[in-house]
Amino acid sequence: SQTMPQVLFTWHGGETLMRPLAFYKKAMELQKKYANGRTIDNCIQTNGTLLTDEWCEFFKENNWLVGVSIDGPQEFHDEYRKNRLGRPSFVKVMQGINLLKKHGVEWNAMAVVNDFNADYPLDFYRFFKEIGCQYIQFAPIVERIMPHQDGRHLASLTDKEKATELADFSVSPEQWGNFLCTLFDEWVKQDVGTYYIQLF
């Protein structure tokens, strides 16, 4: 019922590739059925570990944009990005990225900045350039925690105002500010128009 000429579907939340490929094929059938002349675009966010040739062929054929969650070089990424068995995931993510590149799929990177990696903005940035990523998003992680009778837990949306302590992995305001300033200084001198950072 919308009158806009273009509609963007953003597939996000949890791990999107846990859904079978048939789910997204059906979604596209429904998009085409109800498009009524509008342009339909799709983008999807994934941790990249489940990417296969089949997935990448689908994304390429249907012109999907793929966002990959990768927190920089291996030593940064593997600090917090573990699989369900608690094992590091960097190698699998890079295998997925290489498949996207092999099939010519348009992709970008989403990186979480935390207490462990926030002091190394240039290592982050140069890594993404080395792997051929032209579009980069950086997101600071700040999680509040609540005291609890059996320990501490992350605050829900309803009790955020009562939570005054931050989780240990949260990035501090000073770290985030320094991260952005250092990153901007290098980007503006060398890479404007070649590499794209969402915040700039």
Question: What annotation goes with each model-predicted range?
Answer:
Residues 1-9, 19-22:
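N-terminal catalytic cores of secreted or lumenal carbohydrate-active enzymes
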Residues 1-6, 35-40, 102, 192-194:
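Short helix-terminating capping/connector loops at secondary-structure junctions
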Residues 8-14, 41-46, 197-199:
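Extended hydrophobic secondary-structure segments that form protein cores and membrane-embedded regions
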Residues 16-66, 70-76, 84-95, 99-100, ...:
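Canonical radical SAM enzyme core domain
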Residues 81-91, 98, 102-200:
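Radical SAM enzyme [4Fe-4S]-AdoMet core and its adjacent flexible, acidic
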